[in-house]
Amino acid sequence: MNIRCFCCMGDSITSDQVSGIGTMVAHRLNAQEVLNAACGYATCSDWHEGDRNITPVTLIEPPNTNTADNVLSNQVRRVLQALTPKGSIIRWTVDGIEYAIPAEIGIGTGTLSTPDVIYIAISTNDGNQPENAPADDFAAVCELPYAALTRTSMASSLLWAVRTLQAVCPNAAIFLATPLQTYTPQAWMDESHGLLKRRVIQKVAQKTGVHCIDSFYGSGFDRSVARSHGEVHPDEEWKIRIADFVAKEIESTLYKE
């Protein structure tokens, strides 16, 4: 298998800032070029107060902080920046409408080839702010036009991210991963919320025609394992196991195609 370029987005479990599983997956796939845009503490949904989105548009990578700028949509924007020729305005077109990031925020760097594989594993942190309690509003947002996606829920944010990436990288194989199970007293990471997030991710993958990796059940990192192997962030043994699992899921899917 020849994967020239691998790109991943996500939270601390994927990010090189913490666990680095995204980069481990890339190495198992023998990717020649890797961009790991994931960040610790990142959420899938933009931060919001009620219906008002309070996430700033930025191309600056946050340093593992629980802040409003640390979200999937800004990771997507950083990927677009890397894909845009150096010095050019960052632009993309969806449904015949052109979007652009103002030059004062940032311009293209041209540091990334078009990815063959895009892997997104994010949702564990959704709900860590009271106003951002995770909910399944897929039915309410799944038919909205791209321009109407507010990114103030997981479904809206994932739909926006996938459709943006499909527009810019139409030939890339995109994989969305469901969250790992955890062992923690934090309510937003309990089993019921994990299952809710899993359902949203599966629905978005089906709607957009991308692939879904069911890490929640398929990785083997269940609640009983998490209890003694890192609770939220897998220990060294389980980082290897999870990276192996994800890489095999990607490989088997690509072989079928």
Where would I find each of the regions flagged by the language model?
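A general structural detector for well-ordered alpha-helical segments in enzyme core domains, enriched
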Residues: 21, 75, 154-161, 197-201, ...
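The substrate-binding groove and active-site-proximal loops of carbohydrate-active enzymes
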Residues: 143-152, 230-233
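Conserved SGNH/GDSL esterase-like catalytic core that processes O-acyl groups on lipids
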Residues: 5-8, 13-136, 143, 233
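Conserved beta-strand segments of alpha/beta enzyme cores
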Residues: 33-35, 173, 209-212
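Active-site segments of SGNH/GDSL-like serine hydrolases
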Residues: 121-128, 134, 159-196
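Catalytic His-Asp segment of secreted/periplasmic serine-dependent ester chemistry enzymes
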Residues: 51-52, 179-257
